[in-house]
């Protein structure tokens, strides 16, 4: 059964997005669970984006280039942050869900998931 599961993971694809904080871009990528972050960098270079001296962040933690998509626990719809300055990652991490939410609803404005009034 484990061999079948491993064989099927070869065909599994995740549609993720990479948020380039320096250029204010959100790029879609299609990845496999066994792809490494270095493979993601290669895809970005293929799209004309340099990732030199930049770090990937996911859920406020830095990812290493040798990690696979599975090791980083990325899922379909995940958003990675690619920044050159680590302090910028801490500042921008709370904005990622709002950006994703805005794109999902095709709205031009990002919305907060918090209610506008107090809920007591």
Swiss-Prot record:
Instruction: Cite the InterPro entries for this sequence.
Output: Ubiquitin-like_dom (IPR000626), Ubiquitin-like_domsf (IPR029071)
Ranges of residues in domain Ubiquitin-like: 14-83
Q: Which domain of life is it from?
A: Eukaryota
Leader sequence range is none
The record's account of tissue expression is: Detected in stratum corneum (at protein level).
- Which Gene3D superfamilies does this UniProt record tie to the protein? Phosphatidylinositol 3-kinase Catalytic Subunit, Chain A, domain 1
Tell me what this protein is called.
Answer: Ubiquitin domain-containing protein TINCR
């Amino acid at each position: 059964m484990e061999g079948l599961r491993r064989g099927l993971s070869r065909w599994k694809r995740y549609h993720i997005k990479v948020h380039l904080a320096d250029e204010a871009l959100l790029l879609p990528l299609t990845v496999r669970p066994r792809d490494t972050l270095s493979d993601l960098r290669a895809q970005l270079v293929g799209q004309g984006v340099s990732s030199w001296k930049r770090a990937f962040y996911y859920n406020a933690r830095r990812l290493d280039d040798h990690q696979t998509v599975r090791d980083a626990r990325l899922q379909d719809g995940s958003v990675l942050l690619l920044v050159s300055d680590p302090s910028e990652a801490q500042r921008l991490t709370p904005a990622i869900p709002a950006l994703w939410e805005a794109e999902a609803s095709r709205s031009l404005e990002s919305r907060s998931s918090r209610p506008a009034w107090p809920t007591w």
